[in-house]
Amino acid sequence: MTLPVWVAAAARAATEALLGRPFSASQLLELPDRDEPLAVSVTSAAVLAGGEQALAISHCDPGSGLDLTRGLEIWVCVQWQELVDDELNVHSEAWLNLLAGKGVGTLGSGGEACVSRFARELLSRNLYPLVPSGRGLQLEVVLPRGRDLAARTSNAAFGVVDGLALIGTQADVQVSASPDQLQQTIEQLRRQSAASDFCGAMTLVIGENGLDLARQLGLAAQPLLKIGNWLGPVIVAAAEAGVEQLLLLGYHGKLVKLAGGIFHTHHHLADGRLEVLAAMAVREGLPLDLIRQLGQADSMEAALKMLEAQDPELVRKLWYRLAVTVEHRSAAYLARYGSWSIAIGAALFDRQRRLRWAGPQGSQQLAVLGVTPEDSPISLSLP
C-alpha cells in the first residue's frame, strides 16, 4: 500500500483513541479507488495531554516491490478544534487542519504539507464520520526518518523540501522496478505509436515528476510516456514500434546512469552515479584533485554545486559530454538487439526543475518543440 494509506490508518486509530474507543490494531479504511473496505494494520495508539490529544503509530509496508518507505514509522497526532458555521461542511475541507510535522515534505520552506488529492480524500472519507458535530480535527503527521529518506529522492527538484511528500494517486504501489510495470509501459507505448495521428516522435519521461515538467515545458505536442526504471527494454520496444525520434527526459541523477551503461536505474539494483561523473571528468581533463573531490561528494547535487562554484564553464562542458554519452550509450544498447532507424536524444534537468543540458540529438528534438536548454551546447566541442 502507498504511504497515504498508512497515514490514514494511523490517523483513524488516533481519532478513535481521542473519542475514548478501545484500540484496534486493524483499521478498516474506505478507499476512493476500491469498492470494498481495506483492513490496514496499526502498531499502537494512546491519548496524551490528559485526553486533549491522541497519537497513533503505523509502519509503511509498500508490498513486494523495492521502495525506500518500507518499514517507515509514521506518527499521527490529533486534537479537536472549534469551527464556525461555514466550516462545518465536509466539502469545505476547513474541518481538517493538516500540519506537516518533522519529516513531512512541504512546498517550499515553511510552506503547506505536500499532499496529493488522493491522500486528502482518503483522510476525509475515513475521519469525517468520526468527528463530533461542531468540531474540526487538527492532524499532524510526523515521519521520523522522512528527511533522511527524502535526501535519496528528487523531491527537491520539484520544490518539495524537508521530507517525504504524502503523494500517490491510488492505494496500491505502482512498482516501477517490477516486470508487470514494464509490460504495462510497453503496452501503452504500442498503443501510442499505433495511433492514427502518430508522427514518429515520442518523449520518454522518468517518473511522475518528469511527466509534470514535460507538460510545463510544452512537450505534450508529441506523445509523452512516463516510464519507471526499465529504460533499456522500453528503448528497444520504442524502436520495434516504429518510433523514429525518441527523446529521453529525466533528472540528471537518473540519466547519468545511462552514461555508465546502466539501463535499469532503480537505486536498489544499480547506482554508480558519482563514479560515472568522475569518469566523465577524467575524459574532460579536469584536474586530479577536483576529480578526487567529485568521487568523495555526498551526492550528485553536492558534486554539481562544488563544480559550479569553481568553474561554471567547465560544468557546462562536463554535463554536455555526459548528455552526449547518454545518447551514444543508448544507441549502442539498442544496436545489441537489432538495427532500426531511430534517433535517440537526451535532455537533463536539475533539482531546481531547470532544463539544463541536452545532447546534439536532444537539442534538435527540443528545438522542433520550441524548447531550448539553459546551457546550450552550441559553442562547445568535444575531443
Curated annotation (Swiss-Prot):
Question: Its annotated pathway?
Answer: Cofactor biosynthesis; adenosylcobalamin biosynthesis; cob(II)yrinate a,c-diamide from sirohydrochlorin (anaerobic route): step 6/10
GO MF annotations, alphabetized: cobalt-precorrin-5B C1-methyltransferase activity
Report the record's Gene Ontology biological process terms: anaerobic cobalamin biosynthetic process; methylation
Looking at the keywords, is S-adenosyl-L-methionine present?
yes
Source organism, top-level taxon: Bacteria
Q: Does the record's keyword annotation contain S-adenosyl-L-methionine?
A: yes
Indicate the enzyme's highest-level EC class: transferase
Which InterPro entries does the record match to this protein? CbiD, CbiD_sf
What are the disulfide bonds?
none
Query: Catalytic activity annotated for this protein?
Result: Co-precorrin-5B + S-adenosyl-L-methionine = Co-precorrin-6A + S-adenosyl-L-homocysteine
- What EC number(s) are associated with this protein in UniProt? 2.1.1.195
Q: Which UniProt keywords apply?
A: Cobalamin biosynthesis, Methyltransferase, S-adenosyl-L-methionine, Transferase
Instruction: Give the family this protein belongs to, as stated in its UniProt record.
Output: Belongs to the CbiD family.
NCBIfam families noted in UniProt: cbiD
What name goes with this protein? Cobalt-precorrin-5B C(1)-methyltransferase
